[in-house]
């Protein structure tokens, strides 16, 4: 919403009311001190120019009470008496409909075509390649008349305002006719215009360049992004040709703006004050990008300064609720230093509370998102740790189960071997007589047929050691087998003989015990397989270690045939591992 300032008062007008006021000023040329009375006069006549002009020229219009009941807005107090405004966005009912600023297309440099190419005038915002109208030409002309009148009136008013601005900036010392610089019909510079050419040898340009808010090479879209995401003010400055050596083409107005206003110490002091909440975009309209920006904003003459920010704005009166949009907060006055600073200060102070609230909400939103992300990451990490623990627990349980299964299989294989060992074998033919002595001092003698393999001898001795029975009495073997089965049934580290304990307790013969052992082997899906020996047989004189060879019979070993003596020596775990590695 346009704001008109006059001394200690400010008037919030709609765009239509501002146009009416401008037309009234062009017609009557009233002095600036009559502005409050003129606004009151127009309000009392419903902003109708004809009755207001009639009353104005009658001469009896000053001091008239405000019949529309609209109070005059007082200006923002100075810093000494400034009361902190209430933080928060403006009420919805009073949210203005401000002009919206949009970024340039990302590929505007490629899509832009110089005016006059192929006989057409195109811009990057062209929606159609061509336009044709096949209707009545008279109706088409009628459609264009309102737009032509509006453009002409705006052009005439801008012309007069520019004359007044130039006269005020130059201080009235130049009696020559002021020259008004217009935005060119097409950009005249294809390359980037350096800042040194724009500022030239202007005094205090180094102080201006030291501002954190000013980045000479920043693009328009990047400046808009910063203003939008960080809720900063964007000071958009569009100037003309200030660097040309030809005095006929140089934009004197823009040059005076830079020297007298923008680089003035008071301006620099205020810009430093709001440096953290500001982004400055200073470009020359003879370059492509600022030229397109000027076309978007409807800038016809240079210089122009706009203040842009991401505020609550209604794009149209049909919207019930405003939304955050990059909007033009105001076009700053450039006809004098004091008016420029006053207009800039008023707009900044007006919208600063809203931007502060928006920035705080944005910070809180980012913090909440970061906290939520940290919580989600912690939750995912906790789930991952639980999953790893579950996997480790499952592996541990499986490992323990595998150990139990291996131990059970080892016990069942030895029980099966004991059942086979107690079975009678043929005693015909030659036999080897071997005497055994265990590490505990037990001695016993056994006879083996000549075709008995060394592995079978190991198995036979292993059964005696496993049951701790050193005779061939079937009754002793049966009792030892029953005791062993009962021990395994009561052992929690073993998986066998957990069911059918009554059947196990009543079995007394070797055949019954063999049937029970075979059932356990079948239930665990185990085959006979090789036995694991934790001892070795050694012939002492001469010392010779007998290995459990399945392909060598006892009659092939001179130390054992026909008679021999063997020591049963227990193997340590390290010796067993060495033997396994040698076999591999």
Curated annotation (Swiss-Prot):
Its main location: endoplasmic reticulum. It is found in: Endoplasmic reticulum membrane. The chain crosses the membrane at residues 81-101, 152-172. Keywords: Endoplasmic reticulum, Membrane, Transmembrane, Transmembrane helix, Ubl conjugation pathway. Residues 426-570 form the UBX domain. It is a multi-pass membrane protein. Pfam families: UBA_4. The keyword Transcription does not apply. Integral endoplasmic reticulum membrane protein that coordinates the assembly of the ER-associated protein degradation (ERAD) machinery at the ER membrane. Mediates binding of CDC48 to the E3 ubiquitin ligases SSM4/DOA10 and HRD1, and to ERAD substrates. Component of the DOA10 ubiquitin ligase complex, which is part of the ERAD-C pathway responsible for the rapid degradation of membrane proteins with misfolded cytoplasmic domains. ERAD-C substrates are ubiquitinated through DOA10 in conjunction with the E2 ubiquitin-conjugating enzymes UBC6 and UBC7-CUE1. Present with 12600 molecules/cell in log phase SD medium. PANTHER family: FAS-ASSOCIATED FACTOR 2, FAS-ASSOCIATED PROTEIN. This is UBX domain-containing protein 2. It comes from Saccharomyces cerevisiae (strain ATCC 204508 / S288c).
């Amino acid at each position: 919403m346009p704001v008109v300032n006059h001394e200690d008062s400010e008037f919030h007008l709609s765009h239509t009311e501002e146009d009416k006021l401008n037309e009234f000023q062009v017609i009557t040329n009233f002095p600036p001190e009559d502005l409050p009375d003129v606004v009151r006069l127009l309000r009392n006549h419903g902003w109708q120019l004809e009755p207001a002009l009639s009353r104005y020229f009658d001469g009896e219009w000053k001091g008239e009470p405000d019949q529309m009941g609209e109070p005059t807005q007082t200006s923002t107090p100075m810093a000494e008496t400034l009361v902190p405004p209430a933080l928060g966005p403006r009420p919805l009912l009073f949210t203005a409909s401000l002009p919206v600023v949009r970024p340039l297309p990302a590929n505007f440099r490629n899509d832009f075509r110089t005016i006059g190419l192929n006989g057409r005038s195109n811009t990057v915002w062209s929606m159609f390649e061509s336009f044709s109208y096949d209707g009545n030409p008279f109706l088409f002309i009628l459609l264009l008349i309102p737009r032509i009148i509006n453009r002409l009136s705006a052009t005439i008013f801008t012309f007069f305002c520019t004359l007044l601005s130039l006269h005020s900036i130059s201080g009235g010392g130049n009696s020559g006719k002021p020259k008004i610089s217009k935005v060119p019909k097409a950009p005249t510079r294809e390359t980037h215009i350096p800042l040194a050419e724009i500022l030239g040898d202007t005094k205090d340009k180094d102080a201006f360049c030291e501002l954190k808010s000013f980045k000479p090479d920043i693009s328009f879209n990047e400046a808009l992004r910063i203003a939008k995401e960080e809720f900063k003010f964007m000071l958009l400055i569009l100037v003309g040709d200030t660097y040309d050596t030809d005095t006929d083409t140089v934009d004197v107005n823009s040059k005076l703006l830079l020297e007298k206003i923008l680089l003035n110490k008071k301006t620099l002091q205020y810009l430093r004050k709001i440096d953290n909440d500001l982004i400055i975009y200073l470009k020359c309209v003879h370059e492509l990008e600022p030229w397109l920006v000027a076309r978007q904003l409807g800038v016809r003459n240079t210089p122009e300064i706009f203040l842009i920010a991401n505020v609550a704005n209604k794009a149209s009166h049909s919207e019930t609720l405003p939304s955050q949009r990059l909007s033009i907060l105001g076009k700053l006055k450039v006809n004098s230093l004091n008016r420029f600073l006053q207009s800039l200060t008023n707009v900044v102070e007006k919208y600063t509370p809203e931007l502060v609230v928006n920035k705080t909400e944005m910070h809180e939103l980012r913090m909440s998102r970061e906290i939520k992300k940290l919580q989600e990451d912690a939750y995912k990490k906790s789930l991952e740790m639980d999953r790893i623990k579950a996997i480790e627990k499952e592996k541990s349980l499986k490992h323990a189960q595998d150990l139990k299964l291996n131990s059970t299989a080892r016990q069942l294989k030895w029980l099966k071997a004991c059942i086979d060992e107690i079975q009678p074998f043929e005693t015909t033919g030659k036999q080897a007589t071997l005497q055994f002595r265990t590490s505990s001092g037990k001695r016993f003698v056994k006879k083996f047929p000549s075709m008995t393999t060394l592995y079978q001898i190991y198995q036979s001795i292993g059964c005696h050691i496993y049951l701790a029975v050193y005779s061939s009495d079937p009754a002793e073997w049966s009792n030892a087998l029953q005791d062993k089965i009962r021990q395994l049934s009561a052992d929690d580290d073993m998986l066998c003989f957990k069911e059918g304990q009554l059947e196990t307790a009543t079995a007394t013969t070797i055949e019954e015990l063999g049937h029970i052992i075979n059932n356990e082997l079948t239930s665990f899906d185990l085959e006979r397989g090789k036995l694991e020996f934790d001892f070795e047989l050694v012939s002492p004189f001469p010392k010779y270690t007998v290995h459990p060879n399945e392909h060598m019979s006892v009659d092939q070993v001179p130390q054992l045939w026909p008679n021999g003596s063997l020591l049963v020596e227990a193997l340590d775990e390290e010796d067993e591992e060495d033997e396994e590695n040698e076999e591999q």
